[in-house]
Protein backbone atom coordinates (compact mmCIF):
# COMPACT_ATOMS: atom_id res chain seq x y z
CA UNK A 1 0.00 0.00 0.00
CA UNK A 2 1.25 3.49 -0.70
CA UNK A 3 2.20 5.85 2.11
CA UNK A 4 2.51 9.62 2.16
CA UNK A 5 6.25 9.09 1.60
CA UNK A 6 5.41 7.84 -1.92
CA UNK A 7 3.52 11.00 -2.90
CA UNK A 8 6.44 12.92 -4.42
CA UNK A 9 7.70 9.92 -6.39
CA UNK A 10 4.19 9.24 -7.69
CA UNK A 11 3.95 12.87 -8.85
CA UNK A 12 7.28 12.42 -10.69
CA UNK A 13 6.00 9.25 -12.36
CA UNK A 14 2.80 10.94 -13.54
CA UNK A 15 4.83 13.94 -14.72
CA UNK A 16 6.70 11.61 -17.13
CA UNK A 17 3.54 10.25 -18.77
CA UNK A 18 2.22 12.52 -21.52
CA UNK A 19 -1.35 11.25 -21.78
CA UNK A 20 -2.16 11.54 -18.05
CA UNK A 21 -3.43 14.69 -16.38
CA UNK A 22 -0.83 15.88 -13.89
CA UNK A 23 -2.53 16.91 -10.66
CA UNK A 24 -0.91 18.89 -7.86
CA UNK A 25 1.79 17.25 -5.79
CA UNK A 26 -0.52 17.73 -2.80
CA UNK A 27 -3.19 15.57 -4.44
CA UNK A 28 -0.73 12.67 -4.79
CA UNK A 29 0.26 13.04 -1.13
CA UNK A 30 -3.44 12.76 -0.27
CA UNK A 31 -3.94 9.72 -2.52
CA UNK A 32 -0.99 7.91 -1.01
CA UNK A 33 -1.95 8.85 2.54
CA UNK A 34 -5.75 8.90 2.75
CA UNK A 35 -6.70 6.52 -0.07
CA UNK A 36 -3.90 3.99 0.41
CA UNK A 37 -6.29 1.07 0.91
CA UNK A 38 -7.81 1.63 -2.54
CA UNK A 39 -4.61 2.67 -4.33
CA UNK A 40 -1.41 0.83 -5.11
CA UNK A 41 2.22 1.68 -5.78
CA UNK A 42 4.84 -0.62 -7.29
CA UNK A 43 8.55 -0.03 -6.79
CA UNK A 44 11.51 -1.57 -8.54
CA UNK A 45 14.99 -0.99 -7.15
CA UNK A 46 13.63 1.79 -4.96
CA UNK A 47 11.92 3.66 -7.82
CA UNK A 48 8.16 3.99 -8.28
CA UNK A 49 7.32 2.31 -11.61
CA UNK A 50 3.56 1.87 -11.22
CA UNK A 51 0.67 3.57 -9.48
CA UNK A 52 -3.10 3.32 -9.43
CA UNK A 53 -5.30 5.79 -7.59
CA UNK A 54 -8.76 4.60 -6.73
CA UNK A 55 -11.59 5.06 -4.27
CA UNK A 56 -14.85 3.44 -3.28
CA UNK A 57 -17.57 5.36 -5.10
CA UNK A 58 -19.47 7.41 -2.48
CA UNK A 59 -22.86 6.62 -4.05
CA UNK A 60 -22.08 3.02 -5.02
CA UNK A 61 -20.27 1.21 -2.19
CA UNK A 62 -19.88 -1.89 -4.38
CA UNK A 63 -17.86 0.05 -6.97
CA UNK A 64 -14.15 0.85 -7.05
CA UNK A 65 -13.55 3.92 -9.19
CA UNK A 66 -10.08 4.05 -10.74
CA UNK A 67 -8.86 7.61 -11.20
CA UNK A 68 -5.41 7.10 -12.73
CA UNK A 69 -3.28 4.20 -13.88
CA UNK A 70 0.38 5.02 -14.37
CA UNK A 71 3.06 2.65 -15.60
CA UNK A 72 6.62 3.80 -16.22
CA UNK A 73 7.62 3.58 -19.91
CA UNK A 74 10.14 0.73 -19.48
CA UNK A 75 7.52 -1.36 -17.64
CA UNK A 76 4.74 -1.07 -20.23
CA UNK A 77 3.55 -4.14 -22.10
CA UNK A 78 4.45 -6.46 -19.21
CA UNK A 79 1.01 -6.67 -17.62
CA UNK A 80 1.84 -4.42 -14.68
CA UNK A 81 -1.43 -2.46 -14.94
CA UNK A 82 -3.50 -5.65 -14.84
CA UNK A 83 -1.38 -7.03 -12.01
CA UNK A 84 -1.94 -3.89 -9.92
CA UNK A 85 -5.71 -4.00 -10.50
CA UNK A 86 -5.86 -7.67 -9.50
CA UNK A 87 -3.81 -6.95 -6.38
CA UNK A 88 -6.26 -4.20 -5.43
CA UNK A 89 -9.19 -6.59 -5.84
CA UNK A 90 -7.54 -8.98 -3.37
CA UNK A 91 -7.47 -6.41 -0.57
CA UNK A 92 -9.79 -6.79 2.41
CA UNK A 93 -11.00 -3.17 2.09
CA UNK A 94 -12.24 -3.96 -1.41
CA UNK A 95 -13.94 -7.27 -0.62
CA UNK A 96 -17.42 -5.81 -1.22
CA UNK A 97 -16.51 -4.47 -4.67
CA UNK A 98 -18.50 -5.99 -7.51
CA UNK A 99 -17.70 -3.38 -10.15
CA UNK A 100 -14.74 -1.34 -11.32
CA UNK A 101 -15.37 1.95 -13.08
CA UNK A 102 -12.97 4.31 -14.81
CA UNK A 103 -13.20 7.07 -17.35
CA UNK A 104 -10.98 6.78 -20.41
CA UNK A 105 -10.36 9.20 -23.26
CA UNK A 106 -10.92 7.77 -26.77
CA UNK A 107 -7.25 8.38 -27.65
CA UNK A 108 -5.97 6.45 -24.61
CA UNK A 109 -5.68 3.04 -26.22
CA UNK A 110 -3.47 1.51 -23.49
CA UNK A 111 -6.15 2.18 -20.85
CA UNK A 112 -8.88 0.88 -23.13
CA UNK A 113 -6.93 -2.35 -23.64
CA UNK A 114 -6.21 -2.55 -19.90
CA UNK A 115 -9.86 -2.40 -18.84
CA UNK A 116 -11.17 -4.57 -21.69
CA UNK A 117 -8.45 -7.12 -20.92
CA UNK A 118 -9.26 -7.06 -17.21
CA UNK A 119 -12.92 -7.80 -17.95
CA UNK A 120 -11.86 -10.73 -20.11
CA UNK A 121 -9.48 -12.02 -17.43
CA UNK A 122 -12.26 -11.76 -14.82
CA UNK A 123 -14.73 -13.41 -17.23
CA UNK A 124 -17.20 -10.55 -16.91
CA UNK A 125 -18.61 -7.67 -18.91
CA UNK A 126 -17.12 -4.31 -19.76
CA UNK A 127 -19.79 -1.79 -20.70
CA UNK A 128 -18.56 1.43 -22.30
CA UNK A 129 -20.68 4.56 -22.45
CA UNK A 130 -20.45 8.31 -22.74
CA UNK A 131 -19.74 10.16 -19.51
CA UNK A 132 -17.92 13.50 -19.55
CA UNK A 133 -17.85 15.52 -22.75
CA UNK A 134 -15.18 18.02 -23.73
CA UNK A 135 -17.54 20.90 -22.86
CA UNK A 136 -17.71 19.68 -19.25
CA UNK A 137 -14.05 20.63 -18.79
CA UNK A 138 -12.85 24.21 -18.28
CA UNK A 139 -11.12 25.85 -21.25
CA UNK A 140 -10.45 23.77 -24.34
CA UNK A 141 -8.40 20.80 -25.31
CA UNK A 142 -9.66 18.02 -23.06
CA UNK A 143 -11.16 15.04 -24.82
CA UNK A 144 -14.41 13.37 -23.95
CA UNK A 145 -14.15 10.69 -21.27
CA UNK A 146 -16.02 7.43 -21.67
CA UNK A 147 -17.09 5.40 -18.65
CA UNK A 148 -15.82 1.81 -18.54
CA UNK A 149 -17.84 -0.34 -16.14
CA UNK A 150 -16.45 -3.80 -15.44
CA UNK A 151 -18.52 -6.39 -13.64
CA UNK A 152 -20.09 -7.99 -11.90
CA UNK A 153 -16.88 -9.32 -10.41
CA UNK A 154 -17.32 -12.86 -9.18
CA UNK A 155 -15.09 -13.94 -6.35
CA UNK A 156 -14.21 -17.49 -5.35
CA UNK A 157 -16.28 -17.27 -2.17
CA UNK A 158 -19.47 -16.05 -3.88
CA UNK A 159 -19.64 -18.10 -7.07
Swiss-Prot record:
Residues 1-138 form the N-acetyltransferase domain. Gene3D superfamilies: 3.40.630.30. Its EC number is 2.3.1.178. Keywords: Acyltransferase, Transferase. It is an enzyme of class 2 (transferase). GO terms for molecular function: diaminobutyrate acetyltransferase activity. The keyword Acyltransferase applies. Coiled coil: none annotated. GO terms for biological process: ectoine biosynthetic process. Pathway: Amine and polyamine biosynthesis; ectoine biosynthesis; L-ectoine from L-aspartate 4-semialdehyde: step 2/3. InterPro entries: Acyl_CoA_acyltransferase (IPR016181), Ectoine_EctA (IPR012772), GNAT_dom (IPR000182). Belongs to the acetyltransferase family. EctA subfamily. NCBIfam families: ectoine_EctA (TIGR02406). This is L-2,4-diaminobutyric acid acetyltransferase. It comes from Virgibacillus pantothenticus. The gene is ectA.
Amino acid sequence: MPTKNDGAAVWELIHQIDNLDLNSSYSYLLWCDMFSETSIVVEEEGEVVGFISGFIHPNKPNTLFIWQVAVEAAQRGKGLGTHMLLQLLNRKRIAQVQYIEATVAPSNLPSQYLFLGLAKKLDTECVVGNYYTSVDFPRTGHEDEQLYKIGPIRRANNK
